[in-house]
Amino acid sequence: MQANRTLSLRPATLADAALIASIHAASWQATYRGLLPDVFLDGEVTHERAAYWEARLSAPGGERRIVRIAELDGEPIGFVCAERQPESAWGVLLDNLHALPGYQGIGVGKLLMRAAEDWTRAQGEAQLYLYVLEGNTPAIGFYERQGWQFVGAEPDHMGGRDITALRYVYRLEK
């Protein structure tokens, strides 16, 4: 990243649902090619993510989650969503961490992750967990370099295909 460029975060609002959905879909289209069916990635993923984020951001319980948008010089390039899961023994769910493909490797993922960590600490929680699609080697490598630990795998269904979701945890330092 050029030294004079500014990477910043801002809270997401309901008005950002379509924007978040477009980043989410673009990330999946680039990352999940070969892991999920092309017909899903090239077709319904855009509409599916738009409906998902519209519903999620308008649903009650917003105090249980943080959604932040990363911007580079005011241009949205990524987002993070973390949510308290009171019934979970695993802690706070880092549910989404996505950067547009052209902006990966410039520190946006780390910035978004730190925002989720800070929010988790402020909630009095000591651990985050996430699921990553088996075969998503770049994301797995990123999480492991950040100190996340693999703790298990679960069957799931995504994009019309049975998949394996790998669970990782990250214990926050005090």
Model-identified regions with their sequence ranges:
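Acidic/polar helix N-cap motif
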Residues: 13-16, 136
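Residues that form or flank phosphate/diphosphate-binding pockets in enzymes
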Residues: 89, 107, 138
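Active-site acidic-Proline motif in GNAT/NAT acetyltransferases
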Residues: 100-102, 106, 134-135
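Hydrophobic pocket/interface hotspot
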Residues: 20, 24
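Charged catalytic carboxylate motif
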Residues: 19, 111-112, 138
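C-terminal "cap" of GNAT-fold acetyltransferases
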Residues: 92, 126-141, 145-174
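Acetyl-CoA-dependent GNAT
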Residues: 2-7, 11-14, 25-102, 110-119, ...
